[in-house]
Amino acid sequence: MLLVTNDFPPRRGGIQSYLEAFVGELVRTHELTVYAPKWKGAEEYDEKAARSGYRVVRHPTTLMLPEPTVASRMKRLIGEHDIETVWFGAAAPLALLGPLARRAGARRIVASTHGHEVGWSMLPVARTALRRIGNDADVVTFVSRYTRSRFASAFGPSAALEHLPPGVDTDRFAPDPDARARMRERYGLGDRPVVVCLSRLVPRKGQDMLIRALPELRRRVPDTALAIVGGGPYLETLQRMASDLGVAEHVVFTRGIPAEELPAHHAMADVFAMPCRTRGAGLDVEGLGIVYLEASACGVPVVAGRSGGAPETVLDGKTGTVVDGTDVDAITTAVGDLLADPRRAAAMGVAGRHWALDNWQWRTRGARLAELLSGRREARQA
């Protein structure tokens, strides 16, 4: 089996985490090769991958496109390793190489979608590319029912669309009082009420709205602090905003953190909030939002934005609250209600843990992907 993708560690992001977790499940039962771009730290990562039972082949640049050099290397890998199935980790654009993969000997083509294909589906030339992918692939997977509703017509009536949302490692993401104390000590938060937003720092994620909400949150729940976890191009803008609003000393910017510290940073939260919003006339949208489920698995109540598939990760009113990510008053109310009522927040956290355990296990998701990759079972209508 060959995974061809632009999105793979050690580069970090939502798609990278999604694919890495599925690879971890697949290697239990499959021989797997990953073809991905080079990235800082790749040599060390690839050595660990080899010890875990799969090989990673790196393209010499940091971006792979459906062009001759990538096509040639892919075809060579198919021949060298007797590849029967090629899985394109993100359908757009690399799954345009599907016909070449078949001619090189692959018998089955699977292409996974995320959130950016929604934007592609709104552009005429890109829609044509998606139609070609839908016509050629044996299966096209989607992470949320929202994304399916937005791009299904672009992939065309012959596309076999299958629901393949991510899972959560509920052993790794779990309530952890020791980690909570350790992280709070690291950032000097003590016993303060803490709101955590863990995400790449880009406008869609809504960190700016949490900073705007913080003055009123602090009036309602004294001593509240906001921890913005992650790195990204929006950092300096957010820092200026916190300073302009007079709350800079109450906002912690951790910048990027190691992947192994993600659960510990969730653990320090009283509330997890990422009030995402759709931007760019619908081109920039939240495909699903696994981070909400990771917070739930850690026993933390969540506040999610009503963007794309994000509401599918929350049982509204039970594991958290879904709000309009453009409405600072709604965000303030949702977060403030949870901070002001620790008993209710704790009950939502417990419900979230059960939600993750009962419905979002990686083992179940991995078994379904293995079926789709092998073709052992007929594709089921989503």
From Swiss-Prot:
CDD domains to which the protein is assigned, alphabetical: GT4_PimA-like (cd03801)
Catalyzed reaction equations: a 1,2-diacyl-sn-glycero-3-phospho-[alpha-D-mannopyranosyl-(1<->6)-D-myo-inositol] + GDP-alpha-D-mannose = a 2,6-O-bis(alpha-D-mannopyranosyl)-1-phosphatidyl-1D-myo-inositol + GDP + H(+); a 1,2-diacyl-sn-glycero-3-phospho-[alpha-D-6-acyl-mannopyranosyl-(1<->6)-D-myo-inositol] + GDP-alpha-D-mannose = a 2-O-(alpha-D-mannosyl)-6-O-(6-O-acyl-alpha-D-mannosyl)-1-phosphatidyl-1D-myo-inositol + GDP + H(+)
Keywords recorded for this protein, A-Z: Glycosyltransferase, Lipid biosynthesis, Lipid metabolism, Phospholipid biosynthesis, Phospholipid metabolism, Transferase, Virulence
Gene Ontology biological-process entries: glycolipid biosynthetic process; phosphatidylinositol metabolic process; phospholipid biosynthetic process
Pfam family, one: Glyco_transf_4
Gene Ontology molecular-function annotations: glycolipid 1,6-alpha-mannosyltransferase activity; phosphatidylinositol alpha-mannosyltransferase activity
Family per similarity comment: Belongs to the glycosyltransferase group 1 family. Glycosyltransferase 4 subfamily.
Intrachain S-S bonds: none
Gene3D superfamilies: Glycogen Phosphorylase B
GO terms for cellular component: membrane
Entries under PANTHER family matching the protein: SULFOQUINOVOSYL TRANSFERASE SQD2
Enzyme class: transferase
InterPro entries documented for this protein: Glyco_trans_1, Glyco_trans_4-like_N, Glycosyltransferase_grp1
Pathway as given in its UniProt record: Phospholipid metabolism; phosphatidylinositol metabolism
Protein name: GDP-mannose-dependent alpha-(1-6)-phosphatidylinositol monomannoside mannosyltransferase
Positions contributing to GDP-alpha-D-mannose binding: R200, K205, I257, E294
E.C. numbers: 2.4.1.346
The species this protein was found in: Mycolicibacterium smegmatis (strain ATCC 700084 / mc(2)155) (Mycobacterium smegmatis)
Protein's job: Involved in the biosynthesis of phosphatidyl-myo-inositol mannosides (PIM) which are early precursors in the biosynthesis of lipomannans (LM) and lipoarabinomannans (LAM). Catalyzes the addition of a mannosyl residue from GDP-D-mannose (GDP-Man) to the position 6 of a phosphatidyl-myo-inositol bearing an alpha-1,2-linked mannose residue (PIM1) to generate phosphatidyl-myo-inositol bearing alpha-1,2- and alpha-1,6-linked mannose residues (Ac1PIM2).
